[in-house]
Structures are given as C-alpha cells and as structure tokens.
UniProtKB/Swiss-Prot annotation:
Name of the protein in its database record: Probable transcriptional regulator YgiV
Any one GO biological process: negative regulation of DNA-templated transcription
Record keyword Repressor present: yes
UniProt keyword annotation of Transcription present: yes
Chain's role: Represses expression of mcbR.
SMART domains, sorted: AraC_E_bind (SM00871)
Residues passing through the membrane, by range: none
Listed InterPro entries: AraC_E-bd (IPR010499), DNA_gyrase_inhibitor (IPR050908), GyrI-like (IPR029442), Reg_factor_effector_dom_sf (IPR011256)
Length: 160
C-alpha cells in the first residue's frame, strides 16, 4: 500500500559520487541489472549496501516509454573512484540541487503513485516548477529480511 497523504519537503541535495550501472532496455528486465549491480557490490566491496547509499535514477516513465528506449541507472555511493570492471559499473555523479522529497512506503511496483502525487498534486499547489533532470529514488532500508511491504524509498523530484 502506498502513502495516502504525502509529506513533501524541499531540500538542497548535494552532488554525490556514485558507482553506476546503466540499464538501457525493457523495465521488465530491470531486476537482472539490479542483480548484476549486487554481484559487483559483493565481489568488490567498493559500495557495501550496509555502509553506502543506494539510488535509482529514473530518466523515463516506464508506462509511457517504449521498452527499448527505457533508461534507468542503478547507483551506490562511493568514497573513491572505482576501477574498470567486467560488470559495466562505472563512475558517475548524482546531480545536486533543489528537490521535492516524499517517502514511499511499500512495494516498488507502486512507487509511481508517490511520483505522480508529487508531480500532479503537490507541485501545482506549491508554486514550484520541475527542473529537467531525472527523478531519483533513494532506497533507505535495503537489507536482508526487509519485506517489500516495509521498503522505504525517498522519491526526489528535481525543482527549478
């Protein structure tokens, strides 16, 4: 179940260096890319899930984008540059700036309700404008044993 009311805050988000794995195909295959990123994390220890932040960078809406054109980046914060590797994980940076942030609680399949709640309801009422940049998802409680219903994901909508 998703949030019934949104508690939205405006924050200044700092730029964050990340290890990034681009996903450039059908959203239905995203879990394969996520599994690849997890394998890279475990093998290298460079962005351990229990010490690093985990992000998704949503360039496109899967509901309105052709599967072959869909873009999503899987990211983990890092404290040093990462070397070339066989997984295709590279150095990247999450763009800083002003963002509207709301917490989504529950299954990731329902996260669009929170995204659209910010964009369609909160944004017009706030007088803020959306900046042309991707939406960020910060997965705040990824851990073994956390059920999908208890996942907490902060949704970051870029503001002008």
């Amino acid at each position: 179940m998703t949030n019934l009311t949104l508690d939205v805050n405006i924050i200044d988000f700092p730029s964050i260096p990340v290890a990034m794995l681009p996903h450039r195909c059908s959203p239905e295959l995203l879990n394969y890319s996520v599994a690849k990123f997890i394998m890279w994390r475990k093998e290298t220890g460079l962005s351990p899930v229990n010490q690093s932040q985990t992000f998704g960078v949503a360039w496109d809406d899967p509901a309105t984008t052709a599967p072959e054109a869909f873009r999503f980046d899987i990211c983990g914060s890092v404290s040093e540059p990462i070397p070339d590797n066989r997984y295709g994980v590279s150095n990247g940076e999450l763009t800083g700036g002003r963002y509207a942030v709301a917490r989504h609680v529950g299954e990731l399949d329902d996260i669009s309700h929170t995204v659209w709640g910010i964009i369609r309801h909160w944004l017009p009422a706030s007088g803020e404008k959306m900046r042309k940049a991707p939406i960020l998802f910060h997965y705040t409680n990824l851990a073994e044993g956390v059920t999908e219903q208890r996942l907490e994901t902060d949704v970051y909508v870029p503001l002008a």
